[in-house]
Amino acid sequence: MSETPQTPEPAREDALPEGARHVARLLAGMGHDQPIVLLPSTGKTSAEAAAGLGCDVAQIAKSILFRRAADDTPVLVIASGVNRVDEKKVAAQVGDLARADARFVKEKTGYSIGGVSPIGHVVSPLTLIDEDLLKLSSLWAAAGHPHAVFNLTPTQLVAMTGAPVVDVALRD
């Protein structure tokens, strides 16, 4: 039986990659006192991030970017790590969707896939928050780099993004 890993130590700001430093400055400006943590390995998937943090996969607030088909507006869905996003539900909220490739993600958010933070984008996206995240007391979100994350509550996530909370999960 393996031990649950302990949460990695907070990173010094000067040790953070540029995208994570950007997020750290934004969080500080918002009065958010939780430090950014660097994962020992990538957090590109919810399972990898949860394993590195020793938390439940559901606590990973994953950021998935889509492109609104009508006008190329970025659409950010922040979903629980255990949920698959139901694109039909998202489209019902914002209009028809198209896939966002890595170039679009980087251009619109300033971050690479796997490190998209819920805040601090180059172009402000339309954002939706998975209602399942509000059932949890603590979340971890990407902090601008695939190895960087920060801890927050669902209430803080809603306040930081100003996004509506909706049902976006694909249900059986």
Where are these regions (language model features)?
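Extended, low-hydrophobicity, polar/charged segments
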Residues: 2-172
